[in-house]
Amino acid sequence: VWFDRDVLRLNYDGRGEELGEFQSEDQILVVQPNGDFYVTNFDLSNHYESDILIIEKFQPQKVWTAVLYDADQKYCYLKRFQLEASGRKQNFLGENPKSYLLLLTDEAYPRIAVRFGGVDAFREGLEIDAETFVGVKGFKARGKRVSNYLVEAVEELEPVRFATPSEPVAPSTAEEPEEPEATDEAQSDADLLDEITGQMKLFDK
């Protein structure tokens, strides 16, 4: 099955992006830039919207890693999750329409570079190993705060670890308590000293 972005339809003729071989029970995953996602069958009569970020054969065990700006909390968060097979649109960014996606990857062991900006531009950036930074939760979970500082940009780095076919990633089933507002495990010792001496200020986006 192929997807032709020019006409926003599927075909069996090799036009556009190859989505793979499909059996009768297989489905297609569609992810949009605003965090909406849904699945469809692979009927050639399907017509898709133009604002598609990802379209691919749905793999229910695939783990996604997202970095997003949470408009409710006014901080950037990193979350890892699996998507559900639903024909109706669901959203992994939350209910606030002002939240937005900064990065989405299906790399098994992604590394994320974080650069600070504004009044925090002088601070050294972070390099986050997403797999050890936060566990796999449901797509509605908030995730873990990247930093208390003003994040200007995030970038996916080349991975240094790779998954093997015999190495599935199991989601955590334990409930994760809400993190304390002052906690930031990604801070350096110097940043913690700033907090202790009262020199650090928090800035909303």
Listing of model-derived features with the role each one plays in the protein:
Residues 1-205:
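C-terminal interaction appendages of subunits in large macromolecular complexes
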